[in-house]
């Protein structure tokens, strides 16, 4: 999982990427290609 300052580029890496909020953090998840997971936080 990548930790990024902004998820704009992470969301546009694949069509199946979705943004979710969990426990106050923002994540990009992708069920078909799990290598595209990312978390926002600094």
Swiss-Prot record:
One of its GO terms (molecular function) is structural constituent of ribosome. One of its GO terms (biological process) is translation. The keyword Repressor does not apply. Keywords: Ribonucleoprotein, Ribosomal protein. GO terms for cellular component: ribonucleoprotein complex; ribosome. InterPro entries: Ribosomal_bL36 (IPR000473), Ribosomal_bL36_sp (IPR035977), Ribosomal_L36_bact (IPR047621). HAMAP family: Ribosomal_bL36 (MF_00251). Belongs to the bacterial ribosomal protein bL36 family. This is Large ribosomal subunit protein bL36. It comes from Anaplasma phagocytophilum (strain HZ). The gene is rpmJ.
């Amino acid at each position: 999982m990548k930790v990024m300052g902004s998820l704009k580029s992470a969301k546009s890496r694949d069509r199946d990427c979705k943004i979710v909020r969990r426990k106050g953090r923002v994540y990009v998840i992708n069920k078909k290609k799990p290598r595209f997971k990312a978390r926002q936080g600094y």
